[in-house]
């Protein structure tokens, strides 16, 4: 019910897609699974494409990003990733988070560097640890979470602190 009403009264803002810029990162192509604010911030520096849940394979295959950047998004641009990343209580969960797993496998198979950034640590460490485990590089905003990531990430994955000013 809440989702249905929400779609009727709220129109998500549009994020500029694939706009080249001057500067050191102006040609860097970044495919994103991120909320609106992060997407807009990154779109000012590099070429971005928001990955849709139903068409990410085509975007990856045709656009050929230099990097896939996934953040601890609760909705994603246009609400595409709502309830598809964070661990949800059973009474809310509509389905298992298969799409993000398939995306992570696809970019791994294609050799595209991929990172996960938990901008919501430490409060939402547990909500996003399953997603973090899918990526070879994990960044957190909270350095006190580094030992937790070291203990829970698969061998070969690396966790570090990333402060990304807006």
What residues fall within each predicted segment?
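Membrane-proximal basic amphipathic "stem/tether" segments
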Residues: 1-23
